[in-house]
Amino acid sequence: MTLFEHTLQGNEITRLACSKNTQPLIHPDTIVIHATGGSSAESSARYLANKATPVSAHLVIGRRGEIYQLVPFNVIAWHAGKSTHKGRTNLNRYSIGIELDNAGKLHRRGFQFFTEFGKEIMPSEVYTDYRESKLSFWHTYTEPQLNTLVKIC
């Protein structure tokens, strides 16, 4: 994988046109990482690239490490919303947005785990969190996904 003219190049990269983003991103100095909360990397990338959708991201990284680039790195993506961090507002103006394909919070029924959209997740892909005397269950990230993220960053 290489970087050429603000886009990633390589066999593992799929580019989707996201024509709604046109403002220049001058000097990004921050990376904002999100979970998609979707059913797949491709469906999340297509949703984010859709002209009618009010959000976008530079990249979506799938569970096998595949990459979807929606917005070049020299163009502002709309991934951080109305944000503030360390005294700065509107982080979209300073940051690259990367989405990791992940179902997010899961629901347990007996010994099974399900996404918000009804897909069953195997127990080996579930992280259990215990806070304030309450259990919650989350979809884990995959090793290929995290390796790709590290390589990109």
Locate each region found by the language model.
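Active-site-adjacent loop/helix surface patches within enzyme catalytic domains
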Residues: 2-153
